[in-house]
UniProtKB/Swiss-Prot annotation:
The family this protein is said to belong to: Belongs to the astroviridae polyprotein 1A family.
Molecular-function annotations in GO: 5'-3' RNA polymerase activity; serine-type endopeptidase activity; serine-type exopeptidase activity
Record PTM: Cleaved by the viral and host proteases. The protease is probably autocatalytically cleaved.
Residues recorded with modification O-(5'-phospho-RNA)-tyrosine: 693
Name of the encoding gene: ORF1
Protein name per its UniProtKB record: Non-structural polyprotein 1A
Membrane spanning residue stretches: 239-259, 286-306, 313-333, 344-364
Polar residues bias spans: 805-814
Length: 920
């Protein structure tokens, strides 16, 4: 195809026709076969470039031309390829702006087509799912049985109609309507007005004469009950007339019959009960007794009411005998059913006998109806024990809940205002970390623990005497070892290596005990409570109810920092023991030398006491006896007394806290500032430069000689004590503060107030070395060398003028000796990085005296940073600073503090005041 037709990979490529046509003509079938995988249906740019511009070429082939093709890929990038005769080689891409614009449009079109394809597939899938759901819906509808319409039998409709007809018959109080004319109405109105006027005049006369009798009061009450105050032309009169005409029972039975036919599940039984109640004359008195009946006793009652309609004496006799016969013949039933049947028969007997008595005496059963309702209300009121009672159906299901608390139907906002109160503040949020809690499981019981550092902290009484405990965290069980238990009720458990908690709790740097938060796991549920706390020595008290499993829970502040460990609950208040950073590390056992010193002191005290008291005192050694543990009344009384003592102490502390603002304390003045001698103000000033120190080391001076030279330099440079400014006045300074623990006086020193420069200590001049004959080499004998030094010192020419004695040898120490409490805190990565300076910043003295210890500490720091375990770091730094103190150098922790780079977890600065000279 050389010099043939131009090659085009696709129609878009032909349409755009980018690049050189000659290059397209150079395309061969081999080149076409090995073309890179460009975007389908996309244009390419063909270039015909000199070979030497692409490949390193020499000779005649430099000016040969090669085909270079540039195109886009599926991932949105593009590249250029040159054909070297065998294959296409990728070269640095050549920029063609037209090609890049075209490729962007093509990629965008391809992306839209892909999105369209995916949308169409998703639409087809959703359409198919909808069709499946429609078919499933139709199938499920066919399986559901359709409820048939309620059908009421005709016989019950007829019975309801009969009862309705009976209820519409006028009652016994109905009167026949007479023919009235306008004249009779006028006469009746005048008569009523005259009677009313007469009654009013009589009432006013009695009121004026104060002649009101009891009968008058009863008449007034009767008129109120009869609504005599309602005018005759009012619509209420018409309502009362029809109620009086048809009677209340007839209207109620009419409504109840219609409701029974429409809604009742047993319309036959209900309608027959209404009919027998109406025929017997008991009427409303029957309804309150219905809940006491069963199905059998209900039909017994209906039978007796029908019998009462025909023969009342026979019905009363059968009703009285019914409970007795039921007790005898129904004894085969179970207890619950037996009691229900007897209760229904007794209710039937009471209804028949009481109804007959009421009908005989008053002609109505209203009084019996009121008595039965009163008994039911009294029975219900006697069982209102809780805050509410539940009404259940026959199956035991709660159908209603009625509160027993009396509540106002109106004006209840007064009660709500009194109960809720007016908000006067806003409660703050507290930080909790449930991921830092775990459950401690021991054979004696369970408790709560929390993660802090590399330990699990809990209460000591939760661990007990166990060496190993089980730690439950997020449903998994781990076995852990008890590391340390201090004197407090706290235990520290080593966190297992395969246990990785999601959160850890830190100790509070600035404890705030005003408001505490207790969180723990109780029955696998997280419980949180917030309360105000008070401090009582090393314990806290707060009003929180303790449940089983809360011992060892963390007591935190509002920021989630640990303040104490929950331990006990006696009565109303809960208690916790305050936790300090010093509790995390065990107290080091005294060394053998210290033990021997204590033993010597104890023996000396015994000797002194024996010398003072010659009489021999025989002390009986306590014998270990094993007694069976028992609890008697005295032990219980002691426990109660202990609990009451703690509660009273807490109560006193709370009262004192409340009364603290009212107690005033007189302030006195103690002057400690004016005229006070300020000694050791030049502490920390370098007495030797690096050059001087290096020269002394090169001369090979030993330690004693080196310290003697430093003593002479101090004698030359030190001046008189510095005084405060005379203008400064401290109102709390009365001159007695000159003598204190921080001021050391030399009572043999004579202060010259003429401020003459003191004479430095005399210097001893060394004699010039004289040549001596060479001696044979002898073994090194330190004793002989020491004797020679003494003889050499005796040969020194002493001045004839009397001078002060030479200063005694001394050793220089920088500040106070390091104490372990200053190093015992939570170290982290920042503390480890800043504790040692960079190697170029170390002094020569540090490298010579502390070189090996510094290298060891650097190794410990690197290991701690890699493993994130800083437990060994405090002890290593303490040993290094202790060695520096013994060598007269400044401690590294003090150096960090002096540069304002104290560790962020640093417990407190050491109260150092610079170099201090100690005379041995």
């Amino acid at each position: 195809m050389a010099h043939g037709e131009p090659y085009y990979s696709s129609k878009p490529d032909k349409d755009f026709n980018f690049g050189s046509t000659m290059a397209r003509r150079q395309m061969t079938p081999t080149m076409v076969t090995k073309l890179p995988k460009f975007v389908r249906n996309s244009p390419q740019v063909y270039d015909w470039i000199v070979r030497g511009l692409i490949f390193p070429t020499t000779g005649k082939t430099y000016f040969q031309r090669v085909v270079v093709i540039t195109g886009g890929f599926e991932d949105g990038t593009y590249g250029s390829f040159a054909f070297d005769g065998r294959e296409w080689v990728e070269i640095y891409p050549i920029e063609h702006l037209n090609l890049m614009s075209s490729l962007k449009l093509i990629h965008k079109a391809n992306a839209l087509q892909e999105r369209l394809r995916l949308s169409q597939e998703e639409k087809a899938t959703l359409t198919l799912d909808v069709q499946f759901l429609q078919h499933e819906n139709v199938r499920l509808k066919e399986l559901i049985s359709k409820p048939e319409p309620r059908k009421i039998q005709m016989k019950w409709i007829i019975v309801g109609a009969v009862l309705t007809f009976l209820s519409l018959i006028p009652g016994g109080y109905a009167q026949s309507q007479t023919n009235n004319t306008i004249f009779t109405d006028v006469i009746a109105a005048c008569k009523y007005s005259t009677e009313t006027l007469t009654e009013n005049l009589d009432l006013r006369i009695k009121l004026a004469l104060a002649n009101i009798t009891i009968s008058d009061k009863l008449d007034a009450v009767r008129q109120i009950l009869n609504f005599a105050f309602v005018p005759r032309s009012h619509w209420l009169r018409t309502v009362f007339y029809y109620i009086h005409y048809y009677e209340m029972w007839n209207i109620f039975m009419f409504v109840l019959a219609i409701g029974t036919v429409m809604r009742s599940t047993r319309p036959g039984t209900d309608l027959i009960t209404l009919a027998t109640s109406h025929l017997s004359g008991f009427r409303m008195a029957v309804l309150p007794t219905i809940p006491f009946h069963t199905t059998m006793t209900l039909w017994v009652m209906n039978t007796l009411m029908v019998c009462y309609y025909f023969d009342n004496l026979l019905a009363i006799t059968m009703a009285i005998l019914a409970p007795i016969l039921g007790i005898i013949f129904l004894c085969f039933m179970e207890d619950s059913n037996y009691v229900s049947q007897i209760r229904g028969l007794i209710a039937t007997a009471v209804l028949i006998a009481g109804g007959h008595a009421c009908l005989t005496l008053t002609g109505t059963t209203t009084s019996l109806f009121v008595v039965i309702l009163t008994c039911r209300f009294v029975r219900m009121a006697t069982i209102f024990i809780g805050t509410r009672f539940e009404i259940r159906d026959a199956n035991g299901k709660v159908v209603a809940t009625v509160p027993t608390r009396i509540k106002n139907a109106a004006f209840d906002f007064f009660q709500r205002l009194k109960q809720s109160g007016v908000r006067v503040g806003v409660n703050e949020f507290v930080v909790i970390k449930p991921g830092a809690l775990c459950v401690i499981d021991t054979p004696e019981g369970k408790g709560t623990g929390f993660f802090s550092g590399n330990d699990i902290v809990t209460a000591a009484h939760v661990v007990g005497n166990n060496t190993f405990v089980n730690v439950c965290y997020e449903g998994l069980m781990y076995e852990a070892k008890v590391r340390y238990m201090p004197e407090k009720d706290i235990a520290f458990i080593t966190c297992p290596g395969d246990l990785h908690p999601t959160a850890r709790l830190k100790l509070s740097k600035n404890p705030d005990y005003s408001c505490v938060t207790v969180m723990a796991y109780v029955n696998e549920d997280l419980v949180v409570s917030t309360a105000a706390a008070m401090v009582h020595g090393n314990t806290l008290s707060y009003a929180v109810r303790t449940q089983d499993g809360m011992s060892g829970a963390p007591v935190c502040d509002k920021y989630g920092r640990v303040l104490a460990v929950h331990q006990t609950n006696t009565g109303y208040t809960g208690g916790a023991v305050i936790i300090d950073p010093a509790d995390f590390h065990p107290v080091k056992a005294p060394s053998q030398v210290e033990l021997l010193k204590e033993e010597i002191e104890r023996l000396k005290a015994q000797l002194n006491s024996a010398a003072e008291n010659p009489s021999t005192v025989i002390t009986q050694q306590p014998t270990a006896t094993l007694e069976q543990k028992s609890v008697n009344d005295s032990d219980v009384v002691d426990l109660v007394r202990t609990a009451m003592e703690r509660e009273m102490k807490i109560l006193r502390d709370e009262i004192n806290g409340i009364l603290a603002p009212f107690l005033q304390k007189k302030k006195g003045k103690t002057k400690h500032g004016r005229g006070r001698v300020r000694r050791n103000l030049r502490k920390g000033v370098k007495l030797l430069t690096e050059e001087e120190y290096r020269e002394l080391l090169e001369k090979g001076l030993d330690r004693e000689t080196f310290l003697d030279l430093i003593d002479r330099i101090i004698g030359e440079r030190s001046g008189y004590p510095d005084y405060d400014d005379e203008d400064y006045y401290d109102e709390d300074d009365d001159g007695w503060g000159m003598v204190g623990d921080d001021v050391e006086f030399d009572y043999t020193e004579v202060i010259n107030f003429d401020q003459a420069k003191p004479t430095p200590a005399p210097r001893t001049t060394k004699p010039k070395p004289c040549p001596e004959p060479e001696a044979e080499t002898q073994p090194l004998d330190l004793s002989q060398k020491k004797d020679k030094q003494l003889e050499h010192e005796q040969q020194v020419v002493k001045p004839t003028k009397p001078q002060k004695n030479d200063p005694q040898p001394y050793s220089q120490t920088y500040g106070k000796a390091p104490i372990w409490e200053s190093y015992d805190f939570d170290w982290d990565e920042d503390d480890a990085k800043f504790i040692l300076p960079a190697p170029p910043r170390l002094t020569k003295a540090d490298e010579i005296v502390l070189g090996s210890k510094i290298v060891k500490l650097r190794t410990i720091i690197e290991t701690a940073i890699k493993t994130q375990n800083y437990s060994a770091l405090p002890e290593a730094v303490f040993e290094l600073d202790k060695a520096a103190y013994e060598a007269g150098l400044e401690g590294f922790l003090q150096r960090v503090k002096s540069k304002n780079k104290a560790p962020k977890n640093y417990k407190g600065p050491q109260k150092t005041k610079g170099p201090k000279t100690i005379i041995h």
